[in-house]
């Protein structure tokens, strides 16, 4: 039997797991790693725009715009925003007959 699977057996009152009371360190470590992985995955999906911008530019808000005319700054901001935003217009509708 695998250490990471639980076998459920019917009893008179309810379902119970055979390894639910296990104190095996490997089972405990696998459970902790699984829970941490799930939490990190959820946070990544919720905040992926912020996280990847922070990794790309560090603690700065973006590349320096010193000496760049305001019109070019605005154009650059629009390009960056459009690159990050999800475009819903690219979905394809397929009709089955």
UniProtKB/Swiss-Prot annotation:
One of its GO terms (biological process) is symbiont genome entry into host cell via pore formation in plasma membrane. The gene is M. A lipid is attached at residue 50 (S-palmitoyl cysteine). The lineage of its organism: Viruses, Riboviria, Orthornavirae, Negarnaviricota, Polyploviricotina. Residues 44-97 are intravirion. The record marks 41 as: Seems to be involved in pH gating. It is found in: Virion membrane; Host apical cell membrane. Forms a proton-selective ion channel that is necessary for the efficient release of the viral genome during virus entry. After attaching to the cell surface, the virion enters the cell by endocytosis. Acidification of the endosome triggers M2 ion channel activity. It comes from Influenza A virus (strain A/Chicken/Hong Kong/YU562/2001 H5N1 genotype B). This is Matrix protein 2. The chain crosses the membrane at residues 23-43. It is a single-pass type III membrane protein. The modification Phosphoserine is found at residue 64. When the channel is activated, one or more imidazole moieties of His-37 probably become bi-protonated. Cytoplasmic tail plays an important role in virion assembly and morphogenesis.
């Amino acid at each position: 039997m695998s250490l990471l699977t639980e076998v459920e057996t019917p009893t008179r009152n309810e379902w119970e797991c055979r390894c639910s009371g296990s104190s095996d360190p490997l089972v405990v470590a696998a459970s902790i790693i699984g829970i941490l992985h799930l939490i990190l995955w959820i946070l990544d999906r919720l905040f992926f725009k912020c996280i990847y911008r922070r990794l790309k530019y560090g603690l700065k808000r973006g590349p320096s715009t010193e000496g760049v005319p305001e019109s070019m700054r605005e154009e650059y901001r629009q390009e960056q925003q459009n690159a990050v935003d999800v475009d819903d217009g690219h979905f394809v509708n397929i009709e089955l007959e």
